[in-house]
Amino acid sequence: MCFHSKNLYNEANYVLRQEFIKNGNYISYYDMNKEFKTHENYKLTFSQPANCTLRLLDKNWKSYFRGIKAWKKNPEKFLGMPKLPKYLKKDGRFPWMIPNNQVRYKPENGTVHISNRYMNDYDWKCRCLGRLIQVRFIPRGSCYVMEIVYETEIPDTNGESKNIAAIDLGVDNLVTMTNNIGLNPIIINGNGIKSINQYYNKRLAKEKSLLKIRHGKDWSRKLDVITFKRFQRIKNYMHNTSHYIVNWCIENNIDTLVVGKNDEWKQESTMCKKSNQNFIMIPYQMLLQQLKYKCENVGIKYIEYEETYTSGTSFLDEEEPIKQNYDKSRRIQRGLFKSGTGLLINSDVNGSLQIMKKVFPNAISRYGIEAVLTPVVISVV
């Protein structure tokens, strides 16, 4: 089904691209759906899932148009001009999505029943904590993952921010979290992620070398399995990390979590080759998405804010995190930042405090904070 969904996506995308390139017109989802109802790929995908595939293609095109509009106004914010939605690989797969009118959730035994029209009579064990929206099958290299999409109510987070925690993301220290309630900062060790990536890179290089020598190929099903296992291990590590952070916030009555983010982190990385490889292979966006939905589910206000100039300005000297104050040479040795008065502070803790200061300038005072600047290092499993 995912193969037919891919074929439908490419066929419809071809029609849209040709119409746009030759005539400058865009065909709406409704017209495309009407036109493709008689096509073989539409029938093989089944009408309801085919609708979902065409809707997703329509969404991708509308994102392209929004991107072009934003690029014309502020081209400096982009790495280049947005490109037309691409075709999927000929031998690839695309998610196959079934809407809720073709699926029934049975809360008494925690299963989802998919219409017999699509597959044999079978109940899938799952967890659905709200109104079922969609069931989708996602291709993941050597296997398929079934995802349950549901809608649930979330608590209101519009209240005043009083108890605040701020996070600075890194490599050796995956997460450095500070707060304004007088508790020691927390550092979540990033060595677990580095270990997963190092093992994956070593195994991948060995298998690719043997594959090239024996069969003259660059990729195989075995490499798909290795890559999927690496993805699952990292996803689990990120879930454990986000789970620990949110639970800590709940236990300490934190009502607002601020996370430092740079949209051009990986494009502009200037680290040495080894450090850069570790940095590029850490899926920070996965962690941010998990933190966002987990915070929203428990009523914690979640804020992402750009972190520029936070690593080279001094919290202890009460400097504003702006370009005029930026001086990264004050990071005198690995992991330490020296203030103007000679006090030493963990550089990631300094960055985290400056991130908090960017969003909430009066959330925390520099005076008397030295007593709670020694971070507690945590390892998640």
Mark where each language-model region is:
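Nucleic-acid substrate recognition interfaces
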Residues: M1-V381
